[in-house]
């Protein structure tokens, strides 16, 4: 029986989901997507994603792959899935994939963004931003430069088991628009809660509660101090996966 391989880019508002990955008795993005996929194909099809985003984290560029005996042109597949999915989950692109493509293991790098509002939050942005209340973004910009390069990020993850805590960050920068400050992180991979702990430390630096020297020392892999402030999930978005 012939199998067909598909790759797709998924966007979602993570506000009302317990993260991306399936969990027993919990509403997740993966569970919701696979339910729509089953309704369409009448098959139980496992899907594989590039990133297991946390509860409340959003995506504009999550990449998935799956294989099935169900044959349909990708554009028609995409249209039907979007009809079956709730409005806070959308298939942005869908293509045929090669049999050796893997959404997670074929990925070369990822871009995440963390968004601050310059003004108090309102009904239209409070699920997607946090308020930048009296932050020193000059200091934050200096701290961002320390993040670039290859470092041991043990101090910025909840993971404690023996493993390689080394990651390479190609870009850690600040973009400013009329209404927002946007932190951009482009790296070859990220540990659990790594970006949110980094942002939490940057917030403390921006509020003069934490020094640049202390932050730089933590990036040397010093295991005597861990980041303590976990930035809210709602302002974090997975922007793009590179292959």
UniProtKB/Swiss-Prot annotation:
Query: Any idea which UniProt keywords this protein has?
Result: Isomerase, tRNA processing
Q: Which Pfam families match?
A: PseudoU_synth_1 (PF01416)
- Please give one Gene Ontology molecular function term for this protein: tRNA pseudouridine(38-40) synthase activity
Active-site residues from the entry = 54 (nucleophile)
Gene3D superfamilies recorded: Pseudouridine synthase I, catalytic domain, C-terminal subdomain, Pseudouridine synthase I, catalytic domain, N-terminal subdomain
Q: Does the keyword tRNA processing apply?
A: yes
Q: Which domain of life is it from?
A: Bacteria
> What are the GO BP annotations of this UniProt entry?
tRNA pseudouridine synthesis
* CDD domains to which the protein is assigned, alphabetical: PseudoU_synth_EcTruA
EC numbers, comma separated: 5.4.99.12
Which EC class heads this enzyme's classification?
A: isomerase
Q: What does the record give as the reaction this protein catalyses?
A: uridine(38/39/40) in tRNA = pseudouridine(38/39/40) in tRNA
Binding of substrate occurs at 112
Q: Subunit info?
A: Homodimer.
Annotated function: Formation of pseudouridine at positions 38, 39 and 40 in the anticodon stem and loop of transfer RNAs.
Per the similarity annotation, which family is this? Answer: Belongs to the tRNA pseudouridine synthase TruA family.
The protein's name in its UniProt record: tRNA pseudouridine synthase A
């Amino acid at each position: 029986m012939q199998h067909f391989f598909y790759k797709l880019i998924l966007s979602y508002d993570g506000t009302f989901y317990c993260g991306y990955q399936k969990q027993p008795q919990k509403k997740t993005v993966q569970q919701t997507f696979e339910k729509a996929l089953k309704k369409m194909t009448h098959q139980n099809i496992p899907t594989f994603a590039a990133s297991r985003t946390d509860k409340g984290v959003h995506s504009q560029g999550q990449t998935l792959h799956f294989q099935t005996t169900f044959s349909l042109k990708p554009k028609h597949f995409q249209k039907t899935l979007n009809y079956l999915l709730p409005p806070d989950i959308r298939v942005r692109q869908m293509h045929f994939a090669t049999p050796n493509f893997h959404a997670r293991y074929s990925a070369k790098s990822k871009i995440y963004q963390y968004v601050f509002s310059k003004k108090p939050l309102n009904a239209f942005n409070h699920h997607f931003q946090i308020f930048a209340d009296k932050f020193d973004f000059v200091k934050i910009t200096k701290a961002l430069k320390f993040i670039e390069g290859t470092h041991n990020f043990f101090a910025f993850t909840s993971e404690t088991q023996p493993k390689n805590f080394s990651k390479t960050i190609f870009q850690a920068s600040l973009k400013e628009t009329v209404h927002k400050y946007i932190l951009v992180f482009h790296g070859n991979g990220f540990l659990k809660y790594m970006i949110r702990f980094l942002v939490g430390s940057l917030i403390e630096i921006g509020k003069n509660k934490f020094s640049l020297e202390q932050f730089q020392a933590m990036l040397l892999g010093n295991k005597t101090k861990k980041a303590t402030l976990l930035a809210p999930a709602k302002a974090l978005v997975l922007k793009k996966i590179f292959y």
